[in-house]
Every structure is written in C-alpha cells, then in structure tokens.
C-alpha cells in the first residue's frame, strides 16, 4: 500500500509531498487509524539514558519539526519519536526549493535551514498530544543569532522544552545554518556543554526530574576530531550522542540529477560514513555514554549493523520516506535477530 502512496506523493514536489504526508499522518493519528499500519511493530524493550524504550527504533528529528503529528508517528510503531529542530523564535528557513530527492541513490538533499514555528508553538502541540511514550525534542539556534551567542538560544529552548521532553537533543551539526558546525569543536563546544550541564542541573531541581541531554554530531569529522568530541562529552556529563546528521559529501550521488545541490545529504550514501563515526565513538566512550545511530538505514539489516557498531538505539528518516512504515518493523526484527552477547 505504501508503494502506491509513494508513487503518488513522488509526483509532487518534495516539500509539498512532505507537508501532505505530515498532514495525513497527523490526521491518521487523531483518528487512531495509523495503528492499522503499525500494529505489528515488535516489542523489544531496551533501557537507555535511564528511559525505558518499547523498541530501539525511533523517528529522527526533521520530519516533524513542529510536533504536528506526534500521535500519528507513535502509532506507526516507533519506539520513540524525536521532533524539531526548533528554535526560540519562528523562522521561515531558506528559500524554496530546498528539498531534493535522489531516488536512484535512496537519498535526499535538504537545505531547509531550521524552518519552524518556534519553541512555544511546539510546546503547545506537545501538550495537546495524547502520546505518553518517549519523546525527544531537538533544539537549535535562530539563523540570525550570532554563533558567539548561540548558547543563549539553546538555553532558551532547553528551559521551555525541558518539562515536556523525555530527552532533549542539542543540534550543533546541521550544515544549513551558517557557523553552526563550529560549535562541535574546541572551546566553543566546551563552553556550550558546560552551560547546558549547569542549566540541566538547575532544571532538575526546579522540575524534580532529570531530563537527559543528547548531542547530535556531523558525519564529516575526522577520527581525531571525533575522539576529541567524545572526550568533551564525557567531561561535561552529557547523557548521549546522536551520530549522525547529514553530510556535505557528495560521494555516491555524483552525476545524479540534483546531486550537486547545496545542503545536507541523507539516506543510503551517508550510511558507511555515519556507521564509521559510531564505531569510533564506541571505542572512545567504552560504554560510558550511549550512542543513538542515524544515517542511511534503508533496510532492517542496516539498523542491526548500527547496533553491532556500538549503538544502543537507531533512528530513521530518509529510509522512512523511501520504504514507509514497514521499515520500522523490519529494523526491530533485524535487531531482535542479532546474536546475544555475553554480559
């Protein structure tokens, strides 16, 4: 059924089909119809960040930026749902067109630029949702906020999202906000992590609960840079790392229509690059911090490969666009079929 729907949706522009799909998933959630597609999603409980996940396969941020279809996505069988990226103030993002499909490569290039309705709007939608499962809220900075003041934007979003999130993801790796990726390195990263950790402690006291913080990183780092990031995350006491965001590389899409468009590349071509980052992180973190793997999962076995590389959870986005809800069950089943390691 999804193959037919995809054929129809792919006749529309990528952003139009994205918006229509979000509307349909949201409507299905309100009517309770999406469970007909996701009812067979397996249970494979896992405890990560002190949270109990019904299965380790989640929706990556970016598909539902404003929390418009939380209930709908949850009913499809995801073990957790991450919404955003959201910024303190609403912003329109980059000019259209800004999403491009590369179906021959099972890939997408986007340069959305954190288009969203603002954190206050997102919080109101979370409050209106019926979903009580694991919800991540992904936060970023406004386009016109100078990088040297980015910490302020993250703290504003953290303050407002904290009480409504199971965990909060700090996005310092989108390639579509100028200067953002510089926050992954050196003193900029250290200062950001210190500020977030301190505010997390304050909010824990204020709300009587500790909400874990995850940092989402890029796939375009060297091994040496990845090792330094891992050390900074451990030192600051962050709770998890998400590996990875989209890539600036065009390996695997050379010569394809739209392959040279500006923006972040996601889908199958980023898989090996992202999985390599997971492996490097796993070696450095040595179990001290969980890894959430995202990037290039288009078949169930790819999810299992991420777990084998050292991840505790996985997320899908582009693969969901190309394969539909069936990919959720396939990914859970593939992980469940993995050989058990002695503890």
UniProtKB/Swiss-Prot annotation:
Residues the entry annotates as binding substrate: 65, 110-114, 171, 176, 245-246
Cofactor(s) for this UniProt protein: FMN
Entry's cofactor comment: Binds 1 FMN per subunit.
Residues engaged in binding FMN: 61-65, 85, 138, 171, 216, 244, 267, 296, 317-318
Keyword NAD: no
Membrane topology: Peripheral membrane protein
Catalytic activity as recorded in UniProt: (S)-dihydroorotate + a quinone = orotate + a quinol
Listed pathway(s): Pyrimidine metabolism; UMP biosynthesis via de novo pathway; orotate from (S)-dihydroorotate (quinone route): step 1/1
Residue positions of the active site: 174
One biological process term in Gene Ontology: 'de novo' UMP biosynthetic process
GO annotation, cellular component aspect: cytoplasm; plasma membrane
GO function term, MF aspect, one: dihydroorotate dehydrogenase (quinone) activity
InterPro entries: Aldolase_TIM, DHO_dehydrogenase, Dihydroorotate_DH_1_2, Dihydroorotate_DH_2, Dihydroorotate_DH_cat, Dihydroorotate_DH_CS
Enzyme class: oxidoreductase
Subcellular location: Cell membrane
Entry keywords, A to Z: Cell membrane, Flavoprotein, FMN, Membrane, Oxidoreductase, Pyrimidine biosynthesis
EC nos: 1.3.5.2
Family annotation (Pfam families): DHO_dh
Role summary: Catalyzes the conversion of dihydroorotate to orotate with quinone as electron acceptor.
NCBIfam families: PRK05286.1-1, PRK05286.1-2, PRK05286.1-4, PRK05286.2-5, pyrD_sub2
Entry's family note: Belongs to the dihydroorotate dehydrogenase family. Type 2 subfamily.
Oligomer status and interactors: Monomer.
Protein name: Dihydroorotate dehydrogenase (quinone)
Protein's organism: Pseudomonas syringae pv. tomato (strain ATCC BAA-871 / DC3000)
Higher taxonomy: Bacteria, Pseudomonadati, Pseudomonadota, Gammaproteobacteria, Pseudomonadales
Primary gene name: pyrD
């Amino acid at each position: 059924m999804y193959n037919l729907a995809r054929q129809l949706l792919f006749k529309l522009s990528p952003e139009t089909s994205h918006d229509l799909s979000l509307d349909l998933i949201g409507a299905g959630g309100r009517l309770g119809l999406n469970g007909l597609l996701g009812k067979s999603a397996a249970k494979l409980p896992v405890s990560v960040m002190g949270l109990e996940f019904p299965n380790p396969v989640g929706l990556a941020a970016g598909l539902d930026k404003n929390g418009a279809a939380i209930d709908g996505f949850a009913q499809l069988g995801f073990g957790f749902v991450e919404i955003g990226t959201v910024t303190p103030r609403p912003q329109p993002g980059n000019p259209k067109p800004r999403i491009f499909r590369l179906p021959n490569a099972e890939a997408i290039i986007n340069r959305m630029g954190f288009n969203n309705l603002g954190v206050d709007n997102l919080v109101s939608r979370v409050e209106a949702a019926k979903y009580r499962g694991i919800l991540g809220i992904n936060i970023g900075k406004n386009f016109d906020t100078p990088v040297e003041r980015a910490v302020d934007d993250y703290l504003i979003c953290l303050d407002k999202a904290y009480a409504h999130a199971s965990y909060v993801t700090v996005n310092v790796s989108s390639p579509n906000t100028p200067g953002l990726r510089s926050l992954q390195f050196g003193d900029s990263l250290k200062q950001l992590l210190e500020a977030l950790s301190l505010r997390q402690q304050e909010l824990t006291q204020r709300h009587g609960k500790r909400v874990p913080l995850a940092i989402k990183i890029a796939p375009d780092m060297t091994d040496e840079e990845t090792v330094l990031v891992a050390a900074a995350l451990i030192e600051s006491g962050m709770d998890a790392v998400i590996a990875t965001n989209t890539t600036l590389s065009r390996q695997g899409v050379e010569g394809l229509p739209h392959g040279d468009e500006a923006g972040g590349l996601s889908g199958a071509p980023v898989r090996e690059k992202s999985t390599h980052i997971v492996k490097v992180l796993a070696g450095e973190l040595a179990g001290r911090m969980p890894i959430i793997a995202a990037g290039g999962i288009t078949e169930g076995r790819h999810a299992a490969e991420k777990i084998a590389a050292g991840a505790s959870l996985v997320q899908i986005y582009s693969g969901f666009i190309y394969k539909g809800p069936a990919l959720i069950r396939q990914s859970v089943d593939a992980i469940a079929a993995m050989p058990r390691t002695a503890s």
